[in-house]
Amino acid sequence: MESALTARDRVGVQDFVLLENFTSEAAFIENLRKRFKENLIYTYIGSVLVSVNPYKELEIYSKQNMERYRGVSFYEVSPHLYAIADNSYRSLRTERKDQCILISGESGAGKTEATKKILQYYAVTCPASQQVETVKDRLLQSNPVLEAFGNTKTLRNDNSSRFGKYMDVQFDYRGAPVGGHILNYLLEKSRVVHQNHGERNFHIFYQLLEGGEEDLLRRLGLEKNPQQYHYLVKGHCARVSSINDKNDWKVVRRALSIISFNDNEVEDLLSIVASVLHLGNVQFAADEQGNAQVTTENQIKYLARLLAVEGSVLRDALIHKKIIAKGEELISPLNLEQAAYARDALAKAIYGRTFSWLVNKVNKSLAYKEGEFPGWRSTTVLGLLDIYGFEVFQHNSFEQFCINYCNEKLQQLFIELTLKSEQEEYESEGIAWEPVQYFNNKIICDLVEEKFKGIISILDEECLRPGDATDTTFLEKLEETVKNHPHFLTHKLADQKTRKSLGREEFRLLHYAGEVTYSVAGFLDKNNDLLFRNLKETMCNSENPIINQCFDRTELTDKKRPETAATQFKNSLSKLMEILMSKEPSYIRCIKPNDAKQADRFDEVLIRHQVKYLGLMENLRVRRAGFAYRRKYEVFLQRYKSLCPETWPTWDGRPHDGVAVLVKHLGYKQEEYKMGRTKIFIRFPKTLFATEDALEVRKQSLATKMQATWRGFYRRKKFLHMKHSAIAIQSWWRGTLGRRKAAKRKWAVQTIRRFIKGFIYRNHPRCPENEYFLDYIRFSFLMNLKRNLPKNVLDKSWPTPPPSLCEASQLLRQLCMQNMVWTYCKRISPEWKQQLEQKVIASEIFKGKKDNYPQSVPRLFINTRLGNEEINAKVLQALENEAIKYAVPVIKYDRKGYKARSRQLLLTQNAVIIVEDSKIKQRIDYANLTGISVSSLSDNLFVLHVHCEDNKQKGDVVLQSDHVIETLTKTAMRADKVNNININQGSIKFTVGQGKEGIIDFISGSELLIAKAKNGHLTVVAPRLNSR
């Protein structure tokens, strides 16, 4: 990097304007050589950048380096592409004027690489968003796609552009790229069918064969070996060490997806590329009449499938020619030479039109879409021109003629904008100036493009005139028309010495870049660009969507003769010149250091030739004698008026006087500027940069002042708006409150009136007079009921209803009780439910009948009063599988003597069992239990009545239990004898056995006493606990 060098003299000056001997061409070239040796490939001539192709990678294009040049004044950093790119970008943003960067130089000088580096710089340094990033990617990825289809390896350049490209990049008001458009010029279609020795066809053919997947190649009917294809072997240079076709194929496939190609479009596009290769392999043989016949049917099959046409129709179209004369169709066979011409013409037409379609497809992808960038309608444009350089080959044909004509037009533009226009401007503005001599190539441009007498006009005339026109007749017409032109020479017009270097079918033009000898062979054919009608018809019927778009059916019906290739190119160049003239140009002049494409090799002779024909010395002399910056007074004053108190904020006088006051305030020295008639001219860039720096500082203070003023204005405006809003809200709110209050009063009066009237009619049937009162009464009762509902089923409270709601109140009370009961039942556990069921049965049996029942109510019934451990194991064993449901200790009284004996009463699933220690004394099946008797007193005796016909039973059983209510309830439920419990008053009779009866007498007394009476009865004295 230049910034790392301490001795600037050792590496030359970075601006040729600083050369002491600026008129010496040798000094100019020596300065280039010094810098090239130190890898300093960029040098300025004022604002023009001179670039020497290093033929090697240099570490000067990193993102860090891009940031170094971002937003920095032109001369504050060392010369670089990025400086030119950034200067154009800043001019575009600050002055809102379209810019263009013109990159010129001969083939191999590095123009295409320069274009890519500039696009990369904008992609990194411009403002970004998701949509903008998409546009950036598409702009960058359009390059590898167009290079694959439009670039090739030539003798002088391994990546030579064989078409001209002008790209417009659209920027929004923030400086972000939002779209783009590409114009292409004169694709070298002849390369599809013919290449010179050491050259290749277009890159895409080799990339497809080298990088294409096996499945893809099989579908396209291709093999990986390029030697198998007639159109790829003519240059004998299928593989090049500096080109990696396989990697480039991956780049192209990725780029196609980024610029919105779907899979079907890629397949159709590659089918067309493959069809060109197959078309080149179509061979012909002559029949007995000398007419051509296709000998490679296999190729026709592939072509029919790839181009989506009828194979037989395509075959016939390749060996026949259709002519329409006076409304009649005439079909004539072709000979071998004509058939080969037709095949090659079709291959060139397919590829050329597909390339144009491809450019249009890329343009659709790059097009600025307002929907994606809402509100960004104002856009400016920066153009990049990358067009073929001046070409001189051993054999120069129609393509070189057009390319060199294009370079003449660009040189003319350069002269117009930098040399001639600059000197004319000094004269018109009255600025003292020493004229600089330069060669004006307008004379050469006129020789080529002049109407009626120019080479293109003569060529078109020969192509269009009736009769047998040939390349030779064209040359003769040239000799006749422009024989006296100083820049034109042929074998016939040359002197004896010159004739030795000129063939009889050649002419020589003395271009601004030197002499070029052109062979007229093929000029007429290439200018006509003829494709037989039946081949056009075949392509128009193709079902391949791309081919269908490329070959328009209107061509078949349009009787107007199409423009020739040279005229189309001339008109395209004319439009391009108009585009470039409308923009503010920046120049990059590219130089090729040697023809061998070797790094670190400086061919002084070759470079001197390029310096001369690029007009760099004339450009340098103009820059040394002239001024670096000039602007109209109005523009200059508008931009810098804020730097002077007298001109800010407005100047009411003449702009000339305002600028004079401004530069005086800025302290410009007399030698630093000149005042013209309509413009100010500033000689030194440093003067302008100092002014720009002062403006940047001033902008900060102005921005602060503007912000303060705006904030004050905005706050005051906001305050006044809030004040007005507050007054409006207060007024509205006071009105609202008043209206609410009036409405409330009116409602109150009406309510009171209706209430009183309803009260008067309260006992009448429902009518309009009392419906409001009745509704209010109903509502009040329901609200009161809501607040005073019973809390549980035992709560019997209920609000007293009005007379009209008695029936409804009763229904509601029932519903409420049902709901509480349902809620309570839903909440109780199975154990508690069982307890309640037993209590309910006990209530049904004993309530109001048994004196000691009330004392049993608060006591819970127990599942059993004896555990298994309290029952003898022998008893349990004897019961086997019978589960004991309830067990309780009891006292048994003998049937005769009424002796009391301790026993256990067990209830099983099927029987009542009485147990004495380890022995079962008596088992009474529930079926044999006829009833149970108990007294109404508070004693605990009860009698189990047994069926008398059962011989196993000894008679009824008299028992006493401390839990008589519990025991009898469980026994009744188990035996299903709830209705068979008898509660007796006075005495109970029971069966003793053998038809005898016993009697138990019950007497009220002060305390419990059980004894045998003298009359043989069992007397039970029991205290009365409750009065009935």
UniProtKB/Swiss-Prot annotation:
Keywords of this entry: Acetylation, Actin-binding, ATP-binding, Cell membrane, Cell projection, Cytoplasm, Cytoplasmic vesicle, Membrane, Methylation, Motor protein, Myosin, Nucleotide-binding, Repeat
Myosin motor domain ranges (all copies): 12-696
Cell compartments where the protein resides: Cytoplasm; Cytoplasm, Cell cortex; Cell projection, Ruffle membrane; Cytoplasmic vesicle
GO cellular component, one term: microvillus
PTM sites of type N-acetylmethionine: M1
Actin-binding: annotated span: 573-595
Matches recorded under PROSITE patterns: IQ, MYOSIN_MOTOR, TH1
TH1 domain sequence ranges: 850-1024
Residue ranges occupied by any IQ domain in the UniProt entry: 699-728, 722-751
Keyword Acetylation in record: yes
Gene Ontology MF term list: actin filament binding; ATP binding; microfilament motor activity
Any one Gene Ontology BP term: endocytosis
Sequence positions bearing N6-methyllysine: K348
UniProt xrefs under Pfam families: Myosin_head, Myosin_TH1
Gene3D superfamilies: 1.10.10.820, 1.20.5.190, 1.20.58.530, 6.20.240.20, Kinesin motor domain, Myosin VI head, motor domain, U50 subdomain
SMART domains linked to this entry: IQ (SM00015), MYSc (SM00242)
Residue sites binding ATP per the record: 53, 61, 104-113, 157-161
Subunit: Interacts (via its IQ motifs) with CALM.
Recorded family membership: Belongs to the TRAFAC class myosin-kinesin ATPase superfamily. Myosin family.
Note on domains (UniProt): Binds directly to large unilamellar vesicles (LUVs) containing phosphatidylinositol 4,5-bisphosphate (PIP2) or inositol 1,4,5-trisphosphate (InsP3). The PIP2-binding site corresponds to a putative PH domain present in its tail domain.
Role played: Myosins are actin-based motor molecules with ATPase activity. Unconventional myosins serve in intracellular movements. Their highly divergent tails are presumed to bind to membranous compartments, which would be moved relative to actin filaments.
Protein name in UniProt: Unconventional myosin-Ic
UniProt source species: Gallus gallus
Gene (name only): MYO1C
